[in-house]
Amino acid sequence: MTKSLNNNLKNAKSNKKDEFYTQLSDIGNELRHYKAHFKGKVVYCNCDDPRVSNFFHYFSYNFEKLGLKKLIATCYKSQDIDLFTVNNSEKAVYLEYNGDKNGTNEPEREEIDIIELKGDGDFRSAESIELLKQADIVVTNPPFSLFREYVSQLIEYDKKFLIIGHQNAITYKEIFNLIKDNKIWLGFGFTGGAGHFINTQYENYATATDKKDGMIRVSGVHWFTNLDISKRHDDLILYKKYTPEEQSCPTKHGTAFFVPKYLNKPLLCCTKTEWSLW
């Protein structure tokens, strides 16, 4: 086997391990908080195979209820079909759905346009970017290993989005700066901070009580978004007051400091003079 072919096979297997198909129930549990955002909008799901994607399923079956304008879905093409499951196609395609046409209020095969792409359907490709430009809101589960690059593209094209990522992404410099600048925030999240995803390439180490056949349990996953939600406006009940003697307090310029416990988030920070008045 040549070095080039060997690398392609390794990359293909690696790409397969980066695919986590999301449960319909998890999508529904999160999306119920965002319904007001979707009326008259074009939704783009660009990292889930539209032929098996629960994102496409959710939006197509709720198209009229949400008042969508258009639904588009694309996915990355198999580079070597023999390495992949029957869910993968040798050619990359995108699906376009413009709503119910025959009065059944359910998406049917003849109502969904299937268009073959010239390229591989990668979200970074020129074809995918042209589809992205049409979109108002992007909703999907992007590859965790490409999360920084994926979010960067959404910000570059000024798109609204609701996507799944690992909580470790918060520590990435690029993502942290977006959170700090109030350009991205966390959604409502998965129950218990863990999600079950369809992926046969990993062994499932979940406990017997938390095990689901054909799925892998992934801890620390979360929804990331720039869509406004009620959760962002909930008041935190704070009690702790800090003094300069206790530790360095944040300045008006937003200097951060360490808080060891959730309950120790500062109600306020006082100068020596201000503290003496309490």
Predicted regions: what they are:
Residues 1-278:
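Class I S-adenosyl-L-methionine-dependent methyltransferase catalytic core
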